[in-house]
Amino acid sequence: MKDYLVRGLVNSKNCRVFACQTTNLLEEARKDHDLWPTASAALGRMMSATLMMAAMNKNNEKMTVTINGGGPIGTMMAVTCGDGHIKGFVGDPHVHYTYNDTGHLAVGVAVGTQGSLQVIRDMGLKEPFCGTVPLQTGEIGDDFSYYFMASEQTPSVVSVGVLVEETNEILASGGFIIQLLPEATEEDITYIEERMKDFPAVSSLINEGKTPEEILKMLFEDVEITDHQDLFFTCDCSKDKILNALSTVGKEELQSMIDEDHGCEITCQFCNTKYKFDEEELQKLINRL
């Protein structure tokens, strides 16, 4: 089944909802970055939450989410333009921890809690909007939920999950978000809290073949699906873009690349594509500066 996202409204409970499947795009990321299981789970949860957050706005603004909790996985980043395409990476892809009592992937241990979640929204204005909150658990879902409350004053349930095969392949990835509308009542809040108490893990539901629509129907029988968007893991890097980035290092550094290494090789951190530049290309760049 292809990856996609749906948006919906639940008028009877005064909330809006989002759900997504990201299994295939996470598998692409896993292969590109050689992710180990806990790193896959961390990046998958982050990309699912980022895609759903981007779907809350229909103007295709660029959104960059960065998480660094001081844990061994290092800095994590995901970037999307709200068009269903996303790219992302983790600082150390070879991270794997499990909780001794449950055997579950220990994303919170890998990410850490001594740091922050930052969201930058570039809406094409002079200055992008930037919101930053301290990490709560490092488990990603809790941290996005806290972000929505602290930065956007929107009470939200964020459930994201990943299942990884023993071979490291991705079995299931995705999630859902429930956001209360301003007119929500105490009864609405109580209903949602009760509904979440025994609700199955979203990764298990996706692994069983449940679609995003079916997951939302399990939560709210009367949900009205309002939108659908296909999702992809894609990088927009190119040799020209990397060359433009190289132009910022300065003439002296470029000259030393020519003198010492007779060129250079740059790896895109989002997709691991390697770009080689020979002496002639670097000299042309120096001449342009």
Regions inferred by a protein language model and the residue ranges of each:
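Interaction interfaces in information-processing and related assembly proteins
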Residues: 1-225
